Amino acid sequence: MAAAIRAPRLGQIADGLAAAVAVSLPWSTSATSILIVLWIIAVVPTLDVASVRREVMSPAGGLPVLLWALGAFGMLWADVSWSERIAGLSGFHKLLVIPLLLAQFRRSPHADWVILGFLASSVVLLVVSWALMLTPGLSWRGRELGVPVKNYILQSAIFAICAFGLFGQAAELWRTRPRLAVMLLVLAAAFIANIGYVATARTTLVVLGVMAVLFGLRQFGWKGAVGACLVGAVLTGAVWASSPYLRARVSVAVEQVRNYGTSDVDTPVGLRFEYWKKSLAFVAEAPVIGHGTGTIPALFRRDATAETIPSLITTNPHSQILTVAVQLGILGTAALIAMWIAHLALFRDGTQVAWLGLVLVTYNVVSSLFNSHLFDFGQGWLYVFGVGLTGGMVLRRASIETWDKP
């Protein structure tokens, strides 16, 4: 009897800790790390072997585990020290959490805690960001204007995901609760405006275009996608005309592309091109199984000459696909792409939760063309918790509907 009483309580504690992780994610790496450990300690006793096995045997839960396993085996043929191999595997570890989250939120009725906690935390971050931008002399510990914590890359990613999640919710509520829908649209516009006027990553600008087309396609079909492109073009033109910050961000990137190969490559865009070029050469050396886990720093050191600038010796090729391909070859790349496809397939229905999951996966897939976001701390955990949470909610809904059928 005592065990039966403790189990639901422990389950609620695990749900609460998952919500706490979501709240902390936009703000603090240290707090997020501590809360993730506490969440794992709380959630593991609430899961039975059968439920975890069910998720591991499914594509959505099993392919992340497979990718981690390939990373672990990849240490065996890596020609670097064991400390470098272990460091290389560290980015893969978070993938093991996805089956646990799927199992937890397939069963838990408290997934809304996590979503609302993350949204509330992001709204507070949005308010602080705008306050820093609009109030000269107001100080914060952030190093960049309008970016109170962490960095503009993660902040703009969070704001983009929140904005399109709110767009989806507003579209769903438009007929039944129009006032609430308008409020959600205003909040979404505030997130988008922050990206355009305050702080953004150039990758986020690319992802916004993809998400706009996806939103139009999902809500209104191919005509909606065309409409989204037209509306997006008009809004982009308006923001471009009124935002010196956005013009400067894009103009600098365009100038760096033009100057690449004819002048100094030591620019963010130039370095990316060099990382990609060298990474493709490394992949060609070991195309099937790669050079092994943790070998990226050693490969860039090996390729360096006396004239090589220090910034060209990196641990991160700034492409998720190339990061995996260099270490695990075609085999690892196939597992990565299969995982993304499985997660996209998980969110193929028309519910609002599925839309939110689709937004999370789309952001990670598109941004990973330009960054190794799955292995980064903030973006990686955002993906893992987002997919695990929304995937569990989709599976729970499907289970209930199946159970209710005569």
Ranges and model annotations:
Residues 198-199, 219-263, 275-285, 293:
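A membrane-periplasm/extracellular boundary helix in multi-pass inner-membrane enzymes
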Residues 82-87, 149-152, 199-204, 314-319, ...:
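Membrane-interface catalytic loops of GT-C/OST-like multi-pass glycosylation enzymes that act
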Residues 1-86, 96, 103-116, 169-183, ...:
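Transmembrane signal-anchor hairpin modules in multi-pass inner-membrane enzymes, especially those
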Residues 217, 327-362:
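Hydrophobic transmembrane alpha-helices and their immediate junctions
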Residues 37-44, 212, 339, 357-365, ...:
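Transmembrane alpha-helices of multi-pass inner-membrane enzymes
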